[in-house]
């Protein structure tokens, strides 16, 4: 990150400095990640107040504090009205000091995949920074921006939200040249109230574009019509694996044992691509990533090379061989209606006895039962052989699937899976649920017990 002094921080955040004007090379909001001489940002939430841990941060080696009230702790401090806002303002200042070319993306599902794909392509062109993990909220985005240096030629920033206004804030810090909403689905409905609320929140990403920026839209979602007022006269690119009139599309699609092969069509020409990831939905993700990367000047050679080097990551359709003919797909990291139905499609194209193991989908509010039934109906339409559910809500999935069984605990699910593995020599299992469902426990148990 770029070094700054406390007096500079005070000026940026309209705060008051107390104590020495020390220089800062590292920033953290977590006492477990304190490094010698770093700035500890004391955030305050509904259930916590990090001001209470200032002495702990000092003991771990922190060199200064960013606080919203003066503390007796014997460390230099900058006192501001709101540490969360000041943290963002500091990140915005760092962003303004670097020549890095930046793109930003959001969406209901596939954000991380698109981020990883975009970064893989841009890394073929130069030094690229991208969001680590899922640090995509109003704390994670500033933390990512603070990692920028003048050596970074490109940056790919993922933006997430669980309430209105969050993306408007984080995109104002990010200042991207191109921005994209990957897709829209029922996710975080408790925070947004409806799918229309989700669309409004995600569309905030386009408010951060300059007049000559590029707004990238999923042509398969009609919600972009609601964003026209935000996008204005900015240049628009559309992507879709289905719509032939899109700027970025795919033809000659072939699903192989190595992944997915297709011809990627772009405004500057076509290129044959091997995407070493399962699932047709990843074609759409690859088109989205290509559009973002090409907005910053990536060529077709970089696109082809970048996509070819991708690897599945645990929790996101990660393939695990139980036996030579029995495959476990670990998609347990998270779930909403869009990603669940995409997973159904992936499983439907796999060999053998196709079994989906599902946990609850969280944060769906009043639409929860309907959303779970929708996934079950998708499983039925896709012709899956078996759906096993566990959790208070997911019974609606197995019931609507027509081939389902519901269980009260994961141990019972694992026991049933072991029976099915013994019965079916060729079998594919896909495990998925929201983060709170902790479906990785099923994956881990299957790996530990195998098929005996």
Residue ranges and their predicted role:
Residues 8, 86-219, 224-232, 419, ...:
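Phosphate-binding loop of NTP-binding sites
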Residues 33-42, 146-155, 344-365:
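Mobile, glycine- and charge-enriched loop segments
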Residues 67-74, 178-327, 352, 377-386, ...:
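Acidic, Mg2+-coordinating active-site environments of NTP-dependent enzymes
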Residues 105, 111, 314-318, 436-442:
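ATP-dependent carboxylate/acyl-activation modules
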